[in-house]
Curated annotation (Swiss-Prot):
InterPro entries: Serpin_CS (IPR023795), Serpin_dom (IPR023796), Serpin_fam (IPR000215), Serpin_sf (IPR036186), Serpin_sf_1 (IPR042178), Serpin_sf_2 (IPR042185). GO terms for cellular component: extracellular space. It comes from Saimiri sciureus (Common squirrel monkey). Gene3D superfamilies: Alpha-1-antitrypsin, domain 1 (2.30.39.10), Antithrombin, subunit I, domain 2 (3.30.497.10). This is Corticosteroid-binding globulin.
Length: 406
């Protein structure tokens, strides 16, 4: 019987390097750091690989995903697998089971989940996972206990035979309730039977450490390509901003911080050279950018938009070597022993809102580095990249390519 995995993901957080925290002298901090540092490199490599696969499939479209959320959802799913299916899934996520046990992998994700869930008062964030199982199947209690322990998740039973009037409404109602109405209508229908659905939901609203000037936002042109121009509200701030004109890649970038752990890289490739920059994306590139950014006087223009992406990852994961899940060879015997399951869909949705709000009052939007210096003007009015990371966990929370923000 086919298994349908749906993942709805809405994430926004921030950035950092993958090794620096080992230098912190505080023992408790280092102990916690060890857990999420283990995941950082693995998750980052998976993130860039998945992102590049999606970009290749949609060369002229927006691409926006929450990589760490996808890794977490698939790692959670692996708790229900056995044998070659389990080994292939974890290997596809980047783990070497001869170096790191399955228990250690899930313990690391457990710490990561806890850290991401502990947002400060300046953030509004709701995140969670849930599994919906066909009520005709008997769930193994050990699986339910494991996903509760490691991922704070739960399994709910539904009547999937009555999808239109019962199952879809119950799932949508569950997510709407958990996110206080921020995520609605996760499902509208299925074109094939389902016995198991996995959802992963996140709502995030952050505030900039340095806000954009509300009074300066105005409609401007965004040049999608040589023949397409759209109108977007363009935000503005002027002040001391971390900036880099890359000497190795054809791009400029700035780094902006949210209150709390969030940080965002906005990357502006030269016209026609977007693919060169995307091909070079890696942990080493991010480390080099982080080291090269310098405080500069910048006049910054960024679209005020909602960026989103929704994908069925089935074919992409198969291309990346995670194929057993979708065949009759799939082994989900740690979820139920009542039926032979296989995965039919992996659905992911990510949404990010860019707005002016910050922790400071709007008026003077920045600190001037040198009143006599001519500011660098960065206007994101053509296709650009956005990358959102978390300072504390070094997690890749959003990777995006914005071709048309309208």
């Amino acid at each position: 019987m086919p298994l349908l995995l749906y993942t709805c993901l809405l994430w926004l957080l921030s950035s950092g390097l993958w090794t620096v925290q080992a230098m912190d002298p505080n023992a408790a901090y280092m102990n916690t750091s060890r857990h999420h540092r283990v995941l950082a490199s693995v998750n980052a490599d998976f993130a860039f690989s998945l992102y590049k696969h999606l970009v290749a499939l949609s060369p002229k479209k927006n691409v926006f995903i929450s990589p760490v959320s996808i890794s977490m959802a698939l790692a959670m799913l692996s708790l229900g697998t056995c044998g070659h299916t389990r080994a292939q899934l974890l290997h596809g996520l980047g783990f070497n089971l001869t170096e790191k046990s399955e228990a250690e992998i899930h313990q690391s994700f457990q710490h990561l989940h806890q850290l991401l869930a502990e947002s400060d008062s300046s953030l509004e964030m709701t995140l969670g996972n849930a599994l919906f199982l066909d009520g005709s199947l008997e769930l193994l209690e050990s699986f339910s206990a494991d996903i509760k322990h490691y991922y704070e998740s739960e399994v709910l039973t539904l009547n999937f035979q009555d999808w239109a009037t019962t199952a879809s409404r119950q799932i949508n109602g569950y997510v709407k309730s958990k996110t206080q109405g921020k995520i609605d209508d996760l499902f509208s229908g299925l074109n094939s039977p389902a016995v198991l659905i996995l959802i992963n939901y996140i709502f995030f609203k952050g505030t900039w450490k340095q806000p954009f000037d509300l009074a300066s936002t105005r409609e401007e042109n965004f040049y999608v390509d040589e023949t397409t121009v759209v109108k977007v509200p363009m935000m503005f701030q002027s002040g001391t901003i971390r900036y880099l004109h890359d000497s190795e890649l054809p791009c400029q970038l700035v780094q902006l911080n949210y209150a709390g752990n969030g940080t965002v890289f906005f990357i502006l490739p030269e016209k026609g050279k977007m693919n060169i920059v995307i091909t070079a994306l890696s942990r080493n590139t991010i480390d080099r950018w982080s080291a090269g950014l310098t405080r500069s006087q910048v006049d910054l223009y960024i679209p005020k938009v909602t960026i989103s992406g929704a994908y069925d990852f089935g074919g992409v994961l198969e291309d990346m070597g995670i194929a057993d899940l979708f065949t009759n060879h799939a082994n989900f015997s740690r979820i139920t022993q009542d039926a032979q399951l296989k995965l039919s869909k992996v659905f992911h949705k990510a949404v990010l809102q860019l707005s002016e709000e910050g922790v400071n009052t709007t008026g003077s939007t920045g600190v001037t580095l040198n009143p006599m210096s001519k500011p660098i003007i960065m206007r994101f009015n053509q296709p650009f990249l956005i990358m959102v990371f978390d300072h504390f966990t070094w997690s890749s929370l959003f990777l995006g390519r914005v071709v048309n923000p309208a």
